[in-house]
């Protein structure tokens, strides 16, 4: 059974509980409710193209929007899909290969994502390194 079908049962159960709790505040469900209502923007951490494609499939099934994929070293492989879905990539300029899932990057990753679908792509350069962030203008 595909994983999204397994989650479907959980989603139905959560939806049922939300209906029962109308008028009550269920703090543990506030974030999920915010995502489903569009109030919370989803910033998803993924390295690999297959992970991003799976998350896009889940977002369509459960009707929520992914705003950006962070790190996304394989975003160039699905750049057109990201552009079609209006999903940005918050990408490293030149930091990859430090672990298995961050191995398959190309130096043109940012450019490919940004120029997908004749410039309709969305790519921003970021760093989560305290030294690297100070020198992004050199990358």
Task: Give names to the regions the model predicted.
Residues 41, 80-83, 87-139:
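His/Asp/Glu-enriched, well-ordered alpha-helical/loop segment
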């Amino acid at each position: 059974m595909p994983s999204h079908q397994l989650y479907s049962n959980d989603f139905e159960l959560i939806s049922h509980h939300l209906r029962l709790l109308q008028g009550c505040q269920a703090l543990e469900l506030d974030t999920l409710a915010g995502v489903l209502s569009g109030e919370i923007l989803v910033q998803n951490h993924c390295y690999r193209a297959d992970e991003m494609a799976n998350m896009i499939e889940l977002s369509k099934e459960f009707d929520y929007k992914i705003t950006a994929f962070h790190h996304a070293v394989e975003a160039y492989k699905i750049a057109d899909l990201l552009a079609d879905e209006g999903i940005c990539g918050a990408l490293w300029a030149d930091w990859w290969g430090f672990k298995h899932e961050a191995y398959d990057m190309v130096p043109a990753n940012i450019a490919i994502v940004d120029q997908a679908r004749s410039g309709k792509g969305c790519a921003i350069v970021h760093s989560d390194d305290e030294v690297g962030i100070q020198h992004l203008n050199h990358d």
